[in-house]
């Protein structure tokens, strides 16, 4: 009895108390208070409650239609991301222990109030697009850092424009909405993220996008919704009627937010601004990478970002494009394949050339008549080696900001030399600074001075068949000769004026080849000479041992005059040079080779002679010793045989007693 009473008193009994069902209903299906405060509580205590809940609200709710009054349910705020690891199915709610005992969870009011204030501050300041986040993300990529420094003030102004619509879109009336079937609020043109997706857009992102979508409501391009749950990822999809399109320069343009879904998600059409048409790629687009963050930037090969030529739209375009592009964390996750060069020096831009190496190992310069071979004064972009399959789709308008005073006709295609390369097409674009500073073309090969960069080294190492003179490679003479031979063989349209910087060493090399003897003739002469010398040493080795002043015959080492001897064949029939030059070149080479061979032969002769003398001395010593030993044994045997003529009855065991038969020295 005492043990059972102790269990009842301590609450460790097997039977749970009666008020257990109401908290469990609230924990699993979520009453208004728990759904509103669950996101604001500590992540480890999402099911805690501030006070008792009326039983009418808990029993009257159905499992699939619980009322959700939390703005985080609709907007997918970062607090919802914190609750994502807690959504794993558990057999018991956290309000019960392993024995089934009810453990009341008390919320912490101070943390709740603090988190509410933090959420309000984030909503007011649009924390998702704050400059701090951009600076933090741009610290990892130099290209984004330059753009952030240029677009700092307009970006902050553009983010503040989204505050008026934020309160209406972030806190709509949701008394009759369920967490599974979420209806978009007033002023919201996009479907909300379902509650089971933890990577939805935050309230500040949705508010800013709603404000931008209202500005681009009268857009002539087809507008569609964004696929929910893409985690804020953006990607340009090829449109049907946007191939070869250029923005209308006469009509005022309002660039909407570039808001498209990942290519791998179903129902992901496109919503884009007037001044940002997309060029369709020749290959299917790839979906967003699964390992990237919620705000990563998806790049698509083959899409060209073309800015609006109207200079009046520059500040607003800078804000919107910077907000949609450079606030994402894709600059650090994907490495931002294309780096924007913001230098505005015309002389520097005139000296630089742009080169993109295709993944198939081929690249060619676009003809001057191509409309895409135009560049603004804002700079150009350089493709990094090894990353050409992912072409950067940055639409920074920093270059256009410096052209407010210029007429729209100066900007032909875009603010910066936007490049795109479809995989397998083998076509690259070249921007040479401002349209007024376009380099003159002398055919497919253009001689421009540029220091060899990493992209050029990549092209050279990969053995790509491109115009080397376009980049003005300055390499060693041998490499330049090889490149020149390739250009002559592969490019018949080459003009002589385009290669003034490269020295003409082809004719010199051909002359040197003509002066040199043929390789086959050299091999034959060397083999015959070696055979003759070997035969001489083998046949006259005995004479060399006898004669101390042995020397090779002078006729063999040095033939008389310049006439080719038996070891040296006549001039090669393949030589097309001057016979006099060939005759002059042959004796020099012959004499040099013979001198080296003679010195080596002399040294070898002395060594061989010394070795033979040593071997002969050793042989004499060995034979003399053997003879002395044999004579000593014979003498000893004779003495023993003469001394023992009389037969002894018992032979002595001394050393003189040798049994008859073969002597022991013959057995040696």
UniProtKB/Swiss-Prot annotation:
Signal peptide as annotated in the record: none
Residue segments, region Disordered: 1-142, 155-333, 349-465, 482-521, 642-668
Keyword ATP-binding: no
Alphabetic keyword roster: Chromosome, Meiosis, Phosphoprotein
Entry-linked InterPro entries: Brme1 (IPR031441)
Residue stretches of biased makeup (Low complexity): 279-296, 391-400
Compositionally skewed regions (Basic and acidic residues) per UniProt: 114-125, 208-251
Biased composition (Polar residues): 166-180, 305-316
Functional note: Meiotic recombination factor component of recombination bridges involved in meiotic double-strand break repair. Modulates the localization of recombinases DMC1:RAD51 to meiotic double-strand break (DSB) sites through the interaction with and stabilization of the BRCA2:HSF2BP complex during meiotic recombination. Indispensable for the DSB repair, homologous synapsis, and crossover formation that are needed for progression past metaphase I, is essential for spermatogenesis and male fertility.
Name of this chain's protein: Break repair meiotic recombinase recruitment factor 1
Originating organism: Homo sapiens (Human)
């Amino acid at each position: 009895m005492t043990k059972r009473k102790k269990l009842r008193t301590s609450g460790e009994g097997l039977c749970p108390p009666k008020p257990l069902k109401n908290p469990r209903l609230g924990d699993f299906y979520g009453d208004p208070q728990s759904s509103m405060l669950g996101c604001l509580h500590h992540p480890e205590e999402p099911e805690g409650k501030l006070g008792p809940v009326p039983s009418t609200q808990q029993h009257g709710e159905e499992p699939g239609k619980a009322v959700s009054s939390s703005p985080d349910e609709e907007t997918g705020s970062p607090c919802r991301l914190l609750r994502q690891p807690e959504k794993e199915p558990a057999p018991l709610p956290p309000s019960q222990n392993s024995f089934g005992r009810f453990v009341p969870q008390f919320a912490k009011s101070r943390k709740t109030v603090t988190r509410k204030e933090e959420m309000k501050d984030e909503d007011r300041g649009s924390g998702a697009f704050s400059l701090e986040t951009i600076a933090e993300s741009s610290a990892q990529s130099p290209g984004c850092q330059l753009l952030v420094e240029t677009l700092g003030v307009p970006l902050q102004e553009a983010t503040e424009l989204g505050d008026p619509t934020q309160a209406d879109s972030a806190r709509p009336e949701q008394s009759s909405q369920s967490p599974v079937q979420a209806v978009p609020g007033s002023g919201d043109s996009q479907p909300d993220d379902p509650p089971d997706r933890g990577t939805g857009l935050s309230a500040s992102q949705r508010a800013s996008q709603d404000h931008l979508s209202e500005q681009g409501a009268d857009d002539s391009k087809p507008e569609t919704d964004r696929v929910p749950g893409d985690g804020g990822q953006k990607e340009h999809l090829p449109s049907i009627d946007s191939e070869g399109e250029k923005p209308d320069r006469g009509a005022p343009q309002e660039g909407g937010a570039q808001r498209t879904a990942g290519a791998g998600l179903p129902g992901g059409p496109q919503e884009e601004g007037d001044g940002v048409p997309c060029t369709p790629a020749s290959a299917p687009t790839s979906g967003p990478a699964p390992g990237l963050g919620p705000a990563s930037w998806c790049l698509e090969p083959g899409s060209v970002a073309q800015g609006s030529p109207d200079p009046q739209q520059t500040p607003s375009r800078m804000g919107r494009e910077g907000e949609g592009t450079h606030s994402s964390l894709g600059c650090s996750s994907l490495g931002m394949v294309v780096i924007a060069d913001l230098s505005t020096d015309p002389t520097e831009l005139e000296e630089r050339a742009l080169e993109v190496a295709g993944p198939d190992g081929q690249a060619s310069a676009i003809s001057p008549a191509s409309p895409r071979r135009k560049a603004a004064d804002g700079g150009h972009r350089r493709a990094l080696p090894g990353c050409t399959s992912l072409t950067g789709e940055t639409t920074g308008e920093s270059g256009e900001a410096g052209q407010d005073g210029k007429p729209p006709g100066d900007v032909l295609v875009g603010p910066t030399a936007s490049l795109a390369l479809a995989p397998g097409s083998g076509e690259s674009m070249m921007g040479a600074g401002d349209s007024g500073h376009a380099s003159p073309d002398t055919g497919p090969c253009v001689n421009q001075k540029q220091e060899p960069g990493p992209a050029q080294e990549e092209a050279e190492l990969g053995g790509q068949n491109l115009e080397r003179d376009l980049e003005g490679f300055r390499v060693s003479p041998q490499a330049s000769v090889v490149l020149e031979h390739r250009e002559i063989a592969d490019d018949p349209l080459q003009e002589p004026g385009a290669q003034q910087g490269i020295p003409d060493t082809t004719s010199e090399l051909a002359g040197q080849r003509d002066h040199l003897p043929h390789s086959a003739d050299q091999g034959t002469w060397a083999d015959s000479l070696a055979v003759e010398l070997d035969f001489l040493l083998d046949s006259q080795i005995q004479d060399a041992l006898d004669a101390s002043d042995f020397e090779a015959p002078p006729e063999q080492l040095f033939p008389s005059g310049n006439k080719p001897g038996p070891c040296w064949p006549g001039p090669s029939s393949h030589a097309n040079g001057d016979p006099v030059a060939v005759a002059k070149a042959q004796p020099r080479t012959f004499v040099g080779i013979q001198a080296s061979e003679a010195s080596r032969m002399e040294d070898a002769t002395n060594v061989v002679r010394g070795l033979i003398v040593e071997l002969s001395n050793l042989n004499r010593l060995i034979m003399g010793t053997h003879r002395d030993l044999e004579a000593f044994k014979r003498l000893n045997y004779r003495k023993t045989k003469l001394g023992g003529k009389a037969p002894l009855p018992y032979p002595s065991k001394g050393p003189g007693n040798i049994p008859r038969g073969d002597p022991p020295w013959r057995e040696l």
